[in-house]
Amino acid sequence: MRQQIIDQWVKGEELKDLSVHIKRDEAARILVRALNKEEKEATLADYQEKANKLGLFNSLSASETISKQDAVKILNNAKNVKNGVGNNEGVKEISVEDFMKNPGNVGYELSPDGNYITFNAAWENRRNVFVKKMNDDSEPVRVSSSTDRDIYASFWKDDNLLYLKDKGGDENYHIYSTTFNGNEEKDLTPYPNVTVGVLSSLQGVKDEILIMMNKEDAKVFDVYKLNLKTGETTHVAKNPGNITSWIADRDGNVRMAVASDGVVGTVLYRDSEKDEFKPFIEMESGDQVMPLGFTKDNKHILAKSNKGRDKVEVVKYDLEGNEEVIMSNSEVDVAGVLYNSEKDKVLYGAYVTDKTHYQFFDEDFEKLFRKIQNKLGVRESELVINDYNKEMTKFIVSVSSDTVFGKYYYYDSTTDEITELATLGSWLNPEELAEMHPISYKSRDGLTINGYLTLPKNKEAKNLPLIVNPHGGPWARDMWGFNPEVQLLANRGYAVLQMNFRSSTGYGKEFLEAGNKQWGLKIQDDITDGVQWVIDQGIADPKRIGIYGASFGGYATLAGITYTPDLYAAAVDYVGISNIFTLLNTIPPYWETARKQYYERIGHPENDKELLTAASPVFHADKIKTPLFVAQGANDPRVNKAESDQIVEALRARGVDVECMVKDNEGHVFQNEENRIEFYNTMLKFLDSHLKK
């Protein structure tokens, strides 16, 4: 009787009898075999797993025996999978709010003694700082009261609680102090139009830290010693105008700096703060030598370097400039390492291929890492050591994946106990989310382009609407992991393509420099070639392709609909560049030391005028015919609001209707929760109206 019922459904006949109960695993076996036309038998557990991935059991109870009511749901889910029609049928539609609201407690950090933790959590719709004593039943105490803007980051200095915050997205971050009861918040750097960064926590020095601040000259950062009780600053190092970064030794003495003429850098060194800086490592064009810090004895320097090689490696220099390679990878750049000053040793390093991988240099630390990994039952690429106390006995770790937003845990190695601290996006069910698949394809000139393809659940990977999502930068990269906007799009039935086009970081010097002066040209070709690859696989419907990106991704969006106007049926430009000339004229003052490098990588406004004119979409708006939605923060210090204004005005002058959203209290991408939710709701409606007709 049960088989007869399924046979009727498979043949498309009306179901005549649903009165017979059927076990979940048996239903999984019959339906999966019918849907996939499988000939070979598998285990019942395998069928259940496939059925879950297909979404056949969505919205069902956990009972092993399926009722008549549940049978109807299963068959409807299976019918939707079989037909592959509609708005991602068989998958529960998850609201924009659930993807884009504040996900919960984030940014956990241990106090230096390991007895307290801080984290950021929502209060009055803004992320604020909370503190909690460990191994204690007391409630967390809110110690900040920001109602206009999320706290950017918080950190400890001995028993001092500090946090960073800007105003309206202007990225002029100030350092604030607060107390354990939150009654005394104070801006320690209350100077107009400055931005501050922390250089050293000055271990062993009470109530003082080293900061970098552009107080004297907006274009460059000097070094100051900041008293956390009084707010008094003492000038430690004056920037002559070409220093891009400073490095303090383990005692807090500023003994190293990186200078640049805008293209070529030089690492400078001095024996003490009384001495003059002298060249230590001379770089050539394309070289990167980024000092990470001094070793315990202050006689060696760890650095990330690609000097004399294609890939970034982690090296150790002695004070004579002799180099020892600590970690390298033949395929990709080394992302970073964890150095422990107590052991005077690099414990492990990370590199990113399709996912994040680790190379260990300390046997005890690897055993600890594997123990935590096994306790949590996760893959290596899903586990991160976030923070630890001085003795490295207490740890904050986090777990995330493509379908898991994230979880924080506290691990005490002295008791071997692990405690869950928070689940991000606890209202999201990983089984309802889409997997992120690493992919690669060849560009038209033979480069291997790596990327990711996320496919909607319960939909056959055939003739799907596709959203192309180029990353920002462009000197950045996409990585495997949880991405709320990608999951939102996949949940609504879209395939999402992300690619690391030439000029992306992580793949070596040659790959990055292949994108020099290629905005709108070979970089854009890499994006177009990725779209064509997905079409050739039969996955994407060539008539239902949209493109959406932020920052440089916004530029790539505008370039896509300008230079390949027949490829895209809808486009969303989020804080994107439309005019390269005005971009270069309005960079933040503290980016001035890198101006020549921008000319090298993007183009010179005078020497490359023809190139930049051809590559700026605003001058070719007459080619644009794709429906466009533009979103912009009014206070954006990186991509000025004028970038959006220009393209909107140019298109409207031709009578083209362009949707536009501007938020006066935002900067480079929207940070405030209500603005994020409004933006993504509007974007979805816009995309659906053009790609789901």
Model-derived segments and their meaning:
Residues 1-87:
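N-terminal propeptides
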Residues 501-693:
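Active-site-proximal cap/loop segments of hydrolase catalytic domains
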